[in-house]
């Protein structure tokens, strides 16, 4: 969910005050990075970390589905505040994914294949974006609220599918020592 484009557009589409759109990027970025300072050491104490990524993906999917409900059922300030509030929780889930991803990838994907994996993921997401773009711009009229709500539902379900796939990864136990509590060390 891109806060600069998708969510900013959604804020306007539901008739929420435009000032809410200005808060989206800082919320997503700080809402993901700051909690990592708190949870990083705790996650590293667990030898198998794929569950944290899966949990983060489930949280993100739930938030995107919540945004779909907000867009469909509310308008104005209520819908805008719901989107912003759900983005806060979404960002916390994103933080779990960020903390766990590199460790799991480092243990499960050979170094020589990591670039290919990232490239494949980028290619598939680009093709999906292209398909949605063709649907959007291939019509004579602007798609309605139902179309955008269904896109959010599809995105939420995709997060849940990703959580299930990631949870099935055969991750071996890793190192649990080292890496202090980042917030304490920063202060």
Located regions from the model:
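Cytoplasmic helix-loop-helix junction between adjacent transmembrane helices
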Residues: 88-123
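Hydrophobic core of transmembrane alpha-helices in multi-pass small-molecule transporters
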Residues: 63-70, 77-97
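Glycine-rich segments within core transmembrane alpha-helices of 12-TM secondary carriers
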Residues: 29-36, 63, 118-137
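Helix-loop boundary and gating motifs at the non-cytosolic
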Residues: 1-34, 39, 43, 50-60, ...
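C-terminal membrane-cytosol helix-exit motif in multi-pass small-molecule transporters
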Residues: 93, 136-137, 156-175
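Alpha-helical transmembrane segments of multi-pass secondary-active solute transporters
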Residues: 21, 52, 117, 148-154
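Juxtamembrane intracellular "pre-TM" segments in multi-pass secondary transporters
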Residues: 171-187
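Transmembrane alpha-helix termini and helix-breaking/packing motifs in multi-pass membrane transporters
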Residues: 8-16, 40-46, 68-74, 126-152
């Amino acid at each position: 969910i891109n806060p600069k484009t998708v969510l900013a557009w959604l804020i306007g589409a539901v008739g929420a005050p435009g000032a809410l759109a200005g808060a989206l990027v800082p919320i997503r970025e700080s809402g993901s990075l700051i909690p990592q300072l708190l949870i990083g050491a705790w996650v590293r104490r667990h030898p198998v970390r794929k569950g944290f990524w899966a949990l983060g993906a489930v949280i993100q999917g739930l938030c995107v589905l919540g945004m779909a409900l907000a867009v469909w059922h509310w308008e104005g300030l209520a819908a805008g505040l719901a989107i912003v509030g759900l983005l806060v929780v979404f960002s916390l889930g994103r933080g779990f994914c960020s903390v766990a991803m590199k460790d799991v990838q480092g243990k499960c994907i050979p170094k020589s294949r990591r670039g290919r994996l990232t490239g494949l993921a980028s290619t598939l997401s680009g093709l999906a974006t292209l398909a949605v773009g063709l649907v959007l711009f291939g019509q004579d009229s602007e798609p309605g609220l139902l179309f955008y709500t269904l896109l959010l539902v599809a995105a939420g379900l995709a997060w849940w599918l990703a959580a299930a796939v990631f949870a099935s990864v055969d991750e071996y136990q890793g190192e649990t020592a080292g890496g202090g509590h980042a917030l304490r060390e920063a202060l």
